[in-house]
């Protein structure tokens, strides 16, 4: 019907106030309680980093590095799109920012080389979803803040599914995608030069994750430090003549943040209302009636549920609304909360390219100038990459949680062994 999700959620809350014993005062309190989180303050900083990078010469340097590494392969520009998305995912944490950057920079060149615009939109949208998995992921921040799960652990756990999606898209582009123009393989000196030019912006993920893992700062402080690094180091080097654009970048990042912030507030009130009406008990009883108390079966049931939910609702409000249900089923199935978190996020990421919602695909198709329906058709073969990744994340938790266990063992429930000689982790 075209009604924004935030307004629809608030309408549901108002109906509950009208026809139940819930007071308006309680609901207003929940609206503000939902956004009263220090962790959520990290989101605008990461959005600002992405916007500052997108409007500078830094992006071109990262694209040149991707071209020297994979531009000679079959489907060269398609490979470049995917590899650049991996790079940029480690900076912005926003798939929308990734779509905007790729649509402005690489999409016109793909058009000149004869790539079908529908394929270009489908690939850009699919590749941009890695920004929601590879740290710093905004979805991980929201999930961690709402579900009381380690954000640093979610960052690390998202690396495996993010890289798997990237590799899957590159394999598809190589085997079945348009061939593109044949280009000469870059020499070692060209690769070294491109790496040197892109080294400073690629330090941002190192600063973010290094600081969080070492305990030097929280995710929110990591976002602030990344902003300072971009403003005081990268911009003077890469964009000295366009400082007058900074207010616009700040304003745009604020606008980008206001949309999910409003959704978070509305979803928090709606989720509290659902919990008050015993929604989690009803849904969890229904799911356990089908899947039993088996952890894998509960997880598969939730995957099916969130594939459907992701088709109609944005990921951020979906996470907040369903968090009470997720927590209850995680406890019933004796599932590691970190594993459950990365499964839910990976599944919701799939919804960014599936109709009728498909936000990333919708934005990419508008930027590229192709109908949404045509872009959906060209996306269908790429769905296999996402479904295989989801299956892998569900079936192989030890692989997905390897990095958190190695670098942040407390995030997966490990505790120090007597004598402090190591960690003991749950099976």
Description of each model-found segment:
Residues 1-427:
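Alpha-helical transmembrane segments of multi-pass membrane transport proteins
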